[in-house]
């Protein structure tokens, strides 16, 4: 077979690809040239893990690059693996992958995608406009991406079109059976928890300012952003801007773990005989999981608010704060504001999910002519906008919750129920009163998302989670 016409054609094609990648014409392709080639030929942001994997796998003598012989040997093995993947996805063995076969393959992995999403995926590889993918199109699209099996290919597609971020991740992440079996799921949860801790610490002054304005700002006490920061610094110094951050970080781990376990159980109950959850069912499961987690860790939310608002020397620490609340107000105090908190999950989760899906599908319709991958900036922008819309809808309930958590610690203040507090705010301050502190809340969204993303990606790399 070595001298066959097909073999000669392949070697010519590999030679042309090698020449195109070898930008400095030194007879070798290094990681830098490979990175440029992946970006140029793949039509999207290349995966650093794929570049390193290709170099280490193909380089027989580890000298930092591939010569033509090593490059050709790698591509030959690569094409053989890709051909097996192609046949695995081509369920009716007609030599083409169509939209229904893409959907079936996703369903087999427990991932539900719409017909429109499947068409967008197919369109990103379909060069001849036939709305099917033949072997040549498949090979050319995936030749330089380090994808080892069908699950990897499907997750390359999934992660290029789906990213769901929210302020508190009200609807938990979906993990495939493969991710659960390999242990990638807990590594991603750990990476997310560390990212959340760093992000919350970085934006803690704005978070404390928000709580401060929610509780203390009014028509008679017109607190603005600078005035609020100044009064906090004058009362307790620069370090006081981070009051309440310790418990805010501490509650990430139990909340994430409980939410994930509850979501898996609720999802199993909803699924029944179905293979996958629809978006509406995912919203219901996510909201119930969020409510379950909040029910269990809610005393930590009350402690966070009290510690955030404390005066210098008021409490010796977390345990002292909890002991004093228990002695003076009883155990019920640890669930003050619970009802508006749980009710706030529904508008936040629903609007966050709906706006994100709308923005994502709009972008895919308008701009995904050559690729279904919008890039990380577009995905982060969609996530930020959807999260902000969710916050606007649920903010009045969040404000009422915070006031109820804090009102027992304010001397001479009225002890009101949720409806009583809503009526009091509306009668005294109007609708604007329900949005006190929303400015610093908006100010922290972009830095929080940015810090979270950077730390999350670095943590995934450190933990050995493959990015696709």
From Swiss-Prot:
Keyword Metal-binding included in the entry's annotation: yes
Membrane topology annotation: Multi-pass membrane protein
A Pfam family hit: Mito_carr
Feature: compositional bias, Acidic residues: 58-67
TM region(s), chain numbering: 189-206, 244-263, 287-300, 337-356, 380-397, 437-456
Expressed in which tissues: Expressed at low levels in most tissues examined, with highest expression in brain, skeletal muscle and pancreas.
Residue windows of the Solcar repeats: 183-269, 277-362, 374-462
Region entry Disordered, spans: 34-67
GO CC, alphabetical: mitochondrial inner membrane; mitochondrion
Effect of mutating residue 90 to A: Abolishes the ability to regulate mitochondrial calcium uptake
Residues reported in the UniProt entry to bind Ca(2+) 1: 22, 24, 26, 28, 33
Chain ranges on the Mitochondrial intermembrane side, renumbered to this chain: 1-188, 264-286, 357-379, 457-468
Chain positions covered by the region annotation Regulatory N-terminal domain: 1-149
The reaction(s) this protein catalyses: Mg(2+)(out) + phosphate(in) + ATP(out) = Mg(2+)(in) + phosphate(out) + ATP(in); ADP(out) + phosphate(in) + H(+)(out) = ADP(in) + phosphate(out) + H(+)(in); AMP(out) + phosphate(in) = AMP(in) + phosphate(out); phosphate(in) + ATP(out) + 2 H(+)(out) = phosphate(out) + ATP(in) + 2 H(+)(in)
Cross-referenced Gene3D superfamilies: EF-hand, Mitochondrial carrier domain
Domain EF-hand residues, every copy: 9-44, 77-112, 113-148
Predominant location category: mitochondrion
Effect of residue 33 to K: Abolishes the ability to regulate mitochondrial calcium uptake
InterPro entries: EF-hand-dom_pair, EF_Hand_1_Ca_BS, EF_hand_dom, Mit_carrier, Mitochondrial_sb/sol_carrier, Mt_carrier_dom_sf
Chain intervals for the UniProt region annotation (Linker region): 150-159
UniProt keyword annotations, A-Z: Antiport, Calcium, Membrane, Metal-binding, Mitochondrion, Mitochondrion inner membrane, Repeat, Transmembrane, Transmembrane helix, Transport
Compartment annotation: Mitochondrion inner membrane
Record region (C-terminal transmembrane transporter domain): 165-468
Record-stated family: Belongs to the mitochondrial carrier (TC 2.A.29) family.
Function per UniProt: Electroneutral antiporter that mediates the transport of adenine nucleotides through the inner mitochondrial membrane. Originally identified as an ATP-magnesium/inorganic phosphate antiporter, it also acts as a broad specificity adenyl nucleotide antiporter. By regulating the mitochondrial matrix adenine nucleotide pool could adapt to changing cellular energetic demands and indirectly regulate adenine nucleotide-dependent metabolic pathways. Also acts as a regulator of mitochondrial calcium uptake and can probably transport trace amounts of other divalent metal cations in complex with ATP.
Name of the molecule in the record: Mitochondrial adenyl nucleotide antiporter SLC25A23
Source organism: Homo sapiens (Human)
Lineage: Eukaryota, Metazoa, Chordata, Craniata, Vertebrata
Gene behind this protein: SLC25A23
């Amino acid at each position: 077979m070595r001298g066959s016409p097909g073999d000669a054609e392949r070697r010519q094609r590999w030679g042309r690809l090698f020449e195109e990648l070898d930008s400095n014409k030194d007879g070798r392709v290094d990681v830098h040239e490979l990175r440029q080639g992946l970006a140029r030929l793949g039509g999207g942001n290349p995966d650093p893990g794929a570049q390193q994997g290709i170099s280490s796998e193909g380089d027989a003598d580890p000298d930092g690059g591939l010569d033509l012989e090593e490059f050709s040997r790698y591509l030959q093995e690569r094409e053989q693996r890709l051909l097996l993947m192609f046949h695995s996805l081509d369920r009716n063995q007609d030599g083409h992958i169509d939209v229904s076969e893409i959907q079936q393959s996703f369903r087999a992995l427990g991932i539900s995608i719409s017909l429109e999403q499947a068409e967008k995926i197919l369109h990103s590889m379909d060069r001849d406009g036939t709305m099917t993918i033949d072997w040549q199109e498949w090979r050319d699209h995936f030749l330089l991406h380090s994808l080892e099996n069908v699950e990897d290919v499907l997750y390359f597609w999934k992660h290029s079109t789906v990213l769901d971020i929210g302020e508190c991740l009200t609807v938990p992440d979906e993990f495939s059976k493969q991710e659960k079996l390999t242990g990638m799921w807990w590594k991603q949860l750990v990476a997310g928890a560390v990212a959340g801790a760093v992000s919350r610490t970085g934006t803690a002054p704005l978070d404390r300012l928000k709580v401060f304005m929610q509780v203390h700002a009014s028509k008679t006490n017109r607190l603005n952003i600078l005035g609020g920061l100044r009064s906090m610094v004058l009362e307790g110094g620069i370090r006081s801007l981070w009051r309440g951050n310790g418990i805010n970080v501490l509650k990430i781990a139990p909340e994430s773990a409980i939410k994930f376990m509850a979501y898996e159980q609720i999802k199993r109950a909803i699924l029944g005989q179905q293979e996958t959850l629809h978006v509406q069912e995912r919203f219901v499961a996510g909201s119930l999981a969020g409510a379950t987690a909040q029910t269990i860790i809610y005393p930590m939310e009350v402690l966070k608010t009290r510690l955030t608002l404390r005066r210098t020397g008021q409490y010796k620490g977390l345990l002292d704060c909890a002991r004093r609340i228990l002695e003076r107000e009883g155990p019920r105090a640890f669930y003050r504001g619970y009802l508006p908190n749980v009710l706030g999950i529904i508008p936040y989760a629903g609007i966050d999910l709906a706006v994100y899906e709308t923005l994502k599908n709009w972008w895919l319709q308008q701009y995904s002519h050559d690729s279904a991958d919008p890039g990380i900036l577009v995905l982060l922008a969609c996530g930020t906008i959807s999260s902000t819309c969710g916050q606007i809808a649920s903010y009045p309930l969040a404000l009422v919750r915070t006031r109820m958590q804090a009102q027992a610690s304010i001397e001479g203040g009225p002890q009101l129920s949720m409806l009583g507090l809503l009526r009091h705010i509306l009668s005294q301050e109007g609708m604007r009163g329900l949005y006190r502190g929303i400015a610093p809340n908006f100010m922290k969204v972009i830095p929080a998302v940015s810090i979270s993303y950077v730390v999350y990606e670095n943590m995934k790399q450190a933990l050995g989670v493959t990015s696709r």
